[in-house]
Amino acid sequence: MEFNKEKWKEKLEEKLLEKFSVSLKEASSFEVYRALGETVISFIARDWYETKEKYSKTKQAFYLSSEFLMGRALGNNLINLGIDKEVREFLEEIGIDYNQVEDEEEDPALGNGGLGRLAACFMDSLATLNLPGQGYSIRYRNGIFNQYLRDGYQVEKPETWLKYGDVWSIMRPEDEVIVNFGNGSVRALPYDMPIIGYGTKNVNTLRLWEAHSINDLDLGVFNQQDYLHATQDKTLAEDISRVLYPNDSTDEGKKLRLRQQYFFVSASLQDIIKNFKKVHGREFTKIPEFIAIQLNDTHPVIAIPELMRILVDIEGVLWEDAWEIVKKTFSYTNHTILAEALEKWWVGLYQEVVPRIFQITEGIHNQFKNELAQLYPNDQDKQNRMQIIQGNMIHMAWLAIYGSHKVNGVAELHTEILKERELRDWYELYPEKFLNKTNGITQRRWLLKSNPQLASYITELIGDAWIKDLSELKKLEQFLDDKNVLDRIWNIKIEKKKELVEYLRETQGIDINPNSIFDVQVKRLHEYKRQLLNIFQVYNLYQQLKQNPSMDFTPTTYIFGAKAAPGYKVAKGIIRLINDVAQIINGDNDVKDKLKVVFVENYRVTVAEKIFPAADISEQISTAGKEASGTGNMKFMLNGALTLGTLDGANVEIAKEAGEENEYIFGMRVEDIDALIKKGYDPRFPYNNVSGLKQVVDALIDGSLSDLGSGIYREIHSLLMERGDQYFVLEDFEDYRKTQRTINREYKDKYSWAKKMLKNIANAGKFSSDRTILEYANEIWNIKEAKI
C-alpha cells in the first residue's frame, strides 16, 4: 500500500472527531488506537469488497475451527500492508508513542493453544498467497480465561477483550441466521475480521458468530418482578458464545460444548450454502466444484450431518445424492494421538441437544454399518471397532473419516502413527484418503514482527524474498563460518533477551540475568508435554548446586509459560509445583547468581512474541509418539533457539532439516517405548537406580515441597509410582538430565553455539505455513490463486 501522510492524518483526525469528538492533540492512546484501526479498515475497504466479489466466482476453501488464536491485529496489519515504519514515524512526528498505542489492543480471546494459533497462521498464508479461503468460528465474549497466580496455583478470571468492543470486527446483521436446537432456537449474528495478506491487495475474511436470544426479555414475567427469569432466554443463548471450552466435567458443561459446536457449524453452513445459491442457484451437485470445507480437529465434525440436514430437509436433495456431495466437500485434519482427545458424545445428550442431527447421524451410522458387513463379513471385531455409534457413544473422528474425502495428519511421524496404529483399520479401508501435511507458522508474525532486529539483519545478508518464500533462508548457510555474522546473530539474541528481562521486571517484578542460558518451555499444560520432567530436573540441579557450590555451571534461567484447563487438577498441580520450586530456588542466596525459575503469568500471543526471540533452548520434551506436531518448536527454530527434545511430532523433521548434531535430542523413541511396554515398565527401577531421582520424587510427599494441603502432590506421586508413570517421566529422566548438562557445557563455546543457531534459522524454510497451505490448496482443496 502506498502511504500518503496527509491522507492518513486527515482520515485519522476525521475518525477521532467522528467517534470521540477530540482532536489529534487531545486524543488518548486508546482513542488513537481505535481511530487508527478504523483508518486501516477504511483504506482496505474497497480491496476487501473486491476480494469477496472475486472469490464468489471461484472455488473457495472454508476453514472451520473452534479456535483462532490471532494475536493483536494492528501491528501485524500495518506490517502486511508495508506501512509499519511510515505509520510509526508519522505518529512520532506528531508526538504520539506508537508502542503505547499498540499496547491498547487486547489479544482477541478466540483461542487457547496450538490448534488456534495454527488456524491463525493459515489465515495469514491464505491471504498472502491470494488463495480464496475464509475462516469460521465463534466470537467468544470471554475467551478461555486470564490466568493469575495465587499461592502458586492458577486462578482463572474471564478475559474481557470485548469490554470496549473491537475495532477489527465488523457486524453483519444482514447475514444473521437462526440455529435450532432440541429445546429452542437462537440467533447467530456474524462479525467479520479482515485478514490482510502481506504484499498483496487481497483481504480475506474470518467470520465469527455471536449467539443471541430470539426473545431478550419476557416482559410479562419482568412486570411480575421476576427479573431473573425474565432474561433467562437471553442468558442461556449468550452462554453459547461466552467462553471457549467451558468446563465439561458435568453433563451441563458437556451440553454447552455441544451447543457451541452445533451453533457455529450450523450458522457457517447456512451461510456457505446461501452464498452458493446466489451464484449457482439449486445446482447442488456443483457444491464440491466450488466449496471445500476443512474440519480442524473433531470439534466441527457435526458439520457432516448438518450439511446432510440442509441438503435433504431444506433443499429436498435425495439422501444418496446428498451423501455423495457431502463426502466430496469435507476434509478432516486429525491433531492428536491421545485417545481422550478423539471426541465422543453420549447418545442421550446428543439426542437431547440436536435431535434431528442425531437421526441423521444414526442414518449415516446404519449406512456405514451395512457397508462394513459387506466388506468384512468374517471379521465382526473390525466391524464393531469401526462403527460410528458404539454402545451409547458417537465417535466423531470415525464420522469425520467416513464423511471426508481426505484425512491428514500434521507431521510425518504423526501421520505414520495414525496409519500404522490409531487409524489402521481406516487406512486399510481408505488408503487414498490419508496424507500428511506438516504444520507451519507464518514468518510474517513470528520473525518479521516479533524479531525486527533479526529480520532486518537477514534482509541485509540475503535480501527480503524470505518474507514470502521462507526457503530463501537456506542462503544463510554461506555465512556459517563468518565470525562477523555469528557475532551479530549472538548479539541480536542478547538484545532480545534484555528486552524480555525488562518486560518480566515490569510485569512480574522478577530480575533475571540476560547472559544466562534462557531455557524455555511455553505451551499448554498437559502431562504428555512433560513440564513435570522439566521441573524435576531443575529441582535435582538445585540440589546438586547446593551440595557442590563450586560445580562448573553456566548460569541458567528456566522459563515456563502454560495454562491448565480449569477442570484438569493434575495440570494445575504441576503449575503449583513449578511455582513452589521457583520460590525455593529464587529465594536461596546460595544459587541466586546461577539458577532462576520463572513462570510467566497469562501466557498468550503477545507474550509469546517476546519470548520466542529471546530463547536459547526450546524445550520440546513430550513423550515420543504423543505430540502430533507442535508449532512452538518451529517458532523457536526460526528465531535461532536450539531444540532440546524427544523425536516426537515435528521435532523429527526439525532435526532432519537442521541436522541432529545442531539440536539436543534425548529420550526413548516410539519403538523404544513399544519395547519397554512389551517387556513391562516398572517406574520403581529408575526411581531406585538413577542417582538423585528418588530424592526428587519423594520431595512431593516428604515435606520438602508443599501443595498447601490440597493433596495434589500425593496424587502426582501416585501417578508416577503406583499408576505406572504413563508418560515415562522417570524412565527418560537420566538421559534428559545428561543432555541438559551437555547444553550447559557447550553454551560456553560462543561461536560453535552461534553456528548452530544460524544453521537452525537457515533450515527453517520447510516450516512456513505458506508451504503447508499451498499443499492443502493443491492436494486437498483444489483451489487456485485469485488475485485482485
Language model features: what each stretch is:
Residues 1-788:
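A conserved ligand/cofactor-binding region detector
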